[in-house]
């Protein structure tokens, strides 16, 4: 029996931003990204490559003010796209976790496609800006994603002296955790991974 494609496209159009996101959860890590914030694109590329998710993101935001609306709204729209692509969650492994190092930095991410949004993030960034990305906005991105994907997400940077390294380990670990959680479990085919019978 052929598994259904897990592909979704979502658009978000507000007075502040215009966003288009397309995801293929069973991709090969191909990314086409244009958010207007170079380092943010770099992090989203890590998400695609290490999560093996094909990802297209186009964002036209009010960057003349700052990056807040753009980064947050990309998180919201990406979360909506993931939720749409995942569907009823039948056969999903559901849980994923990963530790990822980069030189002195080490981060751990744990995700649960629980249907219950919750973000617990502890990342003491060593700098306020990485390129054109305000590090405070990393939290806003993940909060937007969590609320609209319906996941519980724990993010901990365990070590790190360089903000670029800290951020990169967070996004790579997030990608690897997603990849694990989104895998289809052949022993759970057609079954929702919860004793409640729904997520």
Curated annotation (Swiss-Prot):
PANTHER family given in the database record: IMIDAZOLEGLYCEROL-PHOSPHATE DEHYDRATASE, IMIDAZOLEGLYCEROL-PHOSPHATE DEHYDRATASE HIS7
Major localization listed first in the record, in broad terms: cytoplasm
Top-tier EC class: lyase
InterPro entries, A to Z: IGPD_sf, ImidazoleglycerolP_deHydtase, ImidazoleglycerP_deHydtase_CS, Ribosomal_Su5_D2-typ_SF
Gene responsible for this protein: hisB
UniProt keyword Lyase, yes or no: yes
Keywords: Amino-acid biosynthesis, Cytoplasm, Histidine biosynthesis, Lyase
Subcellular location: Cytoplasm
UniProt protein name: Imidazoleglycerol-phosphate dehydratase
